[in-house]
Amino acid sequence: MEPLDTLNLWMERARDRARAISFGRFLWHRFLDDRLFQAAAALAYTTVFALVPLAIVVFGVLSAFPVFDRWSDQLSDYVFSNFVPNAARAAEGYLRQFSASAGQLTAAGFIALVVSLLITLNSVEETFNQIWRVGSTRPKLTRFLVYWTVLTLGAMLAAASLAVSARVFAMPLFGTQEGRWLAELALRLAPILIEFVCITLMFRVVPHHTVKWRHAVPGAILAAVILELVKWGIGAYLGSFQSYQKLYGTVAFVPILLLWIYLCWVAVLLGASLSSSMAAFRYQPVELRLPQGYEFYGLLRLLGRFHHARAKGKGLADDEILRLEPMLTDSLLQDLACNLQEIGLLRRDERGEWLLSRDLDQVSLADLYECTQLRIPVAEQHLPYRDDSLGRAALAALDDLRLPLRERLKRKVSDIYTDSGDMP
């Protein structure tokens, strides 16, 4: 889908008042469920311990390639000049000193630094998986390869972009007045564009979930805007409140850096929550909503879809499942899929599609009941799609469970104690 088509689609949906209100409520509940501010605090804490290992890895990668080594100082200066408050610039010197002393580390010290970096990256992935409601994680080796690729390629691409930019801005075109104005505009917009691109790629790569561009881009825009507002707010506050330097002295950069890291994670996680909400939101008219307590009916329909897909030799992606079964929400689908994965009934392939990994004749209703812990509904409710072939089959199986139970539940509680005799 083209970006313009996506924009028109969302504008059309925004004009639907019921849909807009429903999405607003859904987004608010997702914000609360994700506990973003607590997650940002945890990530900020682990990030502080990973700053030195991260600097060692980045500068170590650049120094390994002579063509990039001479750009490491410019890269460090550019990052701290454009993405970190001026009050925290002192951290740059300390990180450079620690990186220069990395060669004096013992094997145990180097391993400890690498472990702290991997813990931080693993925490980021776990937080993103939680936001996207992903119950499974990548294999450990795959995770390590992804982390290492992001760190090494990210450092080299950043240095390469600086080298290309310097070569481009040295062209005669930028020696004219119009060229200088264009160069100044590009330099002003570059930090925002870099933030936007990095966050978009983060949303696409980090979660163990297929995130579409049309969902990642709006979340990245929100995160980049919040980051710019945070930078402006911190600069305005510190510019009007100078006593913090007298209070903290030479370590004044420490609380500023901690606050900045925390607010950066808040911005990124808010954008991630918006992206996941846009992907998960399904507007359901009242007549198509699955009644509360009838999730078992949805489970039986879901397994029917997998049974038919397996007969055709294919799997089902999340989007296709939600299209086939619009009564299911994304959260319910992820919960059911994770429960079925735990008992080895489902597995996810390398393309992110779900596949049946066992024959259904090897699975009983008791197995489904035990692994999902879903209730067996008793009351009568209008069920969506009950008249199609899949609905009739699922409802018949559900009636075999609930109708005898309904008769049993008509028993009076007092009958339980009629023949119990005297209490001890």
From Swiss-Prot:
One of its GO terms (cellular component) is plasma membrane. It is found in: Cell inner membrane. InterPro entries: UPF0761_bac, Virul_fac_BrkB. The chain crosses the membrane at residues 48-68, 101-121, 144-164, 181-201, 216-236, 251-271. Keywords: Cell inner membrane, Cell membrane, Membrane, Transmembrane, Transmembrane helix. Its main location: membrane. It comes from the Bacteria. The keyword Transmembrane applies. It holds the Pfam family Virul_fac_BrkB. It is a multi-pass membrane protein. Belongs to the UPF0761 family. This is UPF0761 membrane protein Smlt0865. It comes from Stenotrophomonas maltophilia (strain K279a).
